C-alpha cells in the first residue's frame, strides 16, 4: 500500500489551493480534526465533520463560515483524499496573525503513522498544559511538547 506525499491545502474562493510551506501565513490554530483513511475508507467520517463544525462554531461564533461554506470546504477535502494508500488528513480553522484578517480553513493530507502492535507510554506528572481540553486543536502545540518530552525519555506517547 503506497503512502501519498504530504499536501497543504488552503480554502480560497470556494476551492482548495495547494500551498508550499513558504506560502503559509502566520496563524493561530483554533480548531482541528484528523482521522485515518485507508484506501479511501474512513470510519465515522460524519462524526469527525460534526466535531469540527461544532468546534468552528464555538471558536468564532458569528464570524464562523456559514454552513454552506463549511460544507463546501469539507466536501472538497473529502474529494481530495487519495483513493489508495494510508493517509491521515487534518482539517484546521486558523486565525491569521494579521490584524483584521478573517479566520481561514486549511487541510493537510499527511502520511498516516505506522501501525503498531504495542507502544510505551509515559505519564505526565505536571499540570494539564491544555487551555481548551474540550476542543481539538488549540492545544496541539502543548500536546506535541509533551509527546516530544516523553519520546526523549524513551516512550512513544505521553498520557
Please report, for each region that a protein language model flagged, where it lies by residue:
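Short secondary-structure junctions
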Residues: 79-88, 152-154
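A short glycine-rich, hydrophobically flanked beta-strand micro-motif that places a catalytic Asp/Glu
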Residues: 87-93, 158-159
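Helix-start/capping segments and mature chain N-termini
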Residues: 1-75, 96-159
